[in-house]
Amino acid sequence: NDCYLEFNQEENADNVLLNPSTGFRNGELERGYLQGKKLTLHNDIFKNDALVFFILKSSEITIKSNSNPHELKFSFEGFPQFGIWAPVGAPFVCLEPWAGVCDEAGYNGEFKDRFATVEVEPNHLYLCSYSMEGK
């Protein structure tokens, strides 16, 4: 429990639950999963698959350690969703800004009608970016 994620804004975000055997959304939310600015990383945090947040106030997440002064700041803009995951027992964590999410199990509709699909009108731009800075 040495490492943690620090968000640059106070959060009150729901975790979108996934079915770990299929990777699909199961239609349920873990309400208020992320509270405040700190999320402690521990061995079981990803046992049920990724943490998926549809709405974050933050535009920066920093990986920090209680025992080491080094840190990695991950900045992002224009991404509506965010995923955080790691294989169980892995010595790393993946921070992924997303523009769209996986379907709920059993979805048979059109691609254009999928939940969280980003639509860009003709002659318009959709801009998003991310950067990383190590210290």
Feature-to-residue mapping (PLM):
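Extended aliphatic helical segments
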Residues: 16, 52, 88, 93, ...
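Short Pro-Gly-centered flexible turn/kink motifs
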Residues: 118-134
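A short, acidic, flexible beta-alpha connecting loop/helix-capping segment that sits on the rim
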Residues: 99-101, 114, 134-135
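Glycine-rich active-site loops that engage anionic ligands at enzyme catalytic sites
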Residues: 65-108
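Short alpha-helix capping/helix-loop boundary micro-motifs
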Residues: 111-117
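Active-site/ligand-binding surface loops and adjacent short beta/alpha elements
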Residues: 1-76
